[in-house]
A protein has these predicted regions:
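Intracellular juxtamembrane helix-capping segments at the cytosolic ends
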Residues: 40, 131-145, 270
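Short amphipathic helix-loop junctions that connect adjacent transmembrane helices
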Residues: 32-54, 259, 268-280
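C-terminal ends and interior cores of transmembrane alpha-helices
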Residues: 79-80, 91-114
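Central cavity-lining transmembrane alpha-helices of secondary-active solute carriers
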Residues: 53-80, 100
Length: 283
């Protein structure tokens, strides 16, 4: 009985408000990734876009690999109007989620057979907003709970993230198939409906941010000038890291900068292969 109670106490942490918030925010974070990578390549190939062009379009996903470049700005830069009302973390979360929703609606309004460039720009907006959301969400998670609670928050975050990836992968194909009905062949309207549904799903994250408390912010040193602010936000973190680890810092920073590139650029070509071989109905 004691062991059973111990298990109940362990599982109870996952029903706490903080854990449920991270479940919803994890869903919001995981939703856009496939929609600008694997799922988008599926749509484009079914629309008859050649594989070379699809390969080039995978470069929009490099926003995830290089998000460390603007991470210091997200960490320190206040947003006029929003930061005063929501706080530093929630303001960036809300802005990034609105960017993602707007970008997905932009993608849903396009026909890649007629005009591919607007879709690329919309996908860039989604990728940039998603990468920015990842930055702000990591900071929010770390600052909103004690060290003892971080494991539970990370677990619920990953659960929400993986559920969203299933929805943004298989779920999109299911919605598109329902929207297509009995029509045979490629139907752009089906994909537009599916991406519109995905944009609507971003409401999960937006509502969660608006209802969540802002974590206690850590104090930032005052900056007397723009130059000093830029130095403390962009230069000082890297300088401190290099001072601590010296030559090993270059290896670590290099790995951080490039480890996702192969996954982002090469993994996107799997779905065009499936479309060519078996088609959407059998995937």
């Amino acid at each position: 009985m004691t062991s059973f109670r111990a298990w109940l106490c362990t599982l109870k942490v996952y029903t706490q408000p903080a854990s449920l918030r991270m479940l919803a925010l994890g869903f919001s974070a995981g939703l856009p990734l496939l929609l600008v990578l694997g799922t988008l390549s599926f749509w484009l190939r079914e629309a008859g876009i050649d594989r070379t062009t699809i390969g080039y379009l995978s470069w929009v996903g490099l926003a995830y690999a290089f998000k460390w470049v603007w991470a210091p700005l997200v960490d320190r830069l206040p947003l006029p109007g929003l930061t005063r009302r929501l706080g530093r973390r929630r303001s960036w979360l809300l802005l990034s989620q609105l960017l993602i929703a707007a970008g997905l609606l932009g993608m849903a309004s396009q026909n890649p057979q007629l005009a591919l460039t607007p879709m690329v720009w919309s996908a860039l907006v989604v990728a940039f907003g998603s990468a920015t959301q990842d930055i702000a969400l990591d900071a929010y998670r770390i600052e909103s709970a004690s060290m003892q609670e971080q494991a539970a928050l990370a677990a619920t975050y990953q659960t929400g993230y993986r559920l969203a990836m299933i929805w943004a992968g298989a779920g999109v194909l299911w919605v598109a198939t329902l929207a297509q009905g009995a029509q045979l062949g490629y139907a752009v309207r089906a994909w537009q409906v599916a991406y519109s549904v995905m944009a609507a799903c971003m409401v999960v994250g937006i509502v969660t941010v608006l209802l969540s408390p802002e974590p206690q912010p850590r104090p930032l040193p005052p900056s007397r000038s723009v130059q000093e602010w830029l130095h403390s936000a962009l230069v000082a973190p890297f300088a401190d890291f290099i001072a601590r680890y010296r030559w090993q810092a270059a290896l670590v920073l290099g790995l951080i900068a490039v480890y996702r590139i192969s996954d982002v650029v090469m993994g996107i070509m799997a779905n065009p292969f499936y479309v060519d071989k078996i088609g959407r109905a059998h995937v």
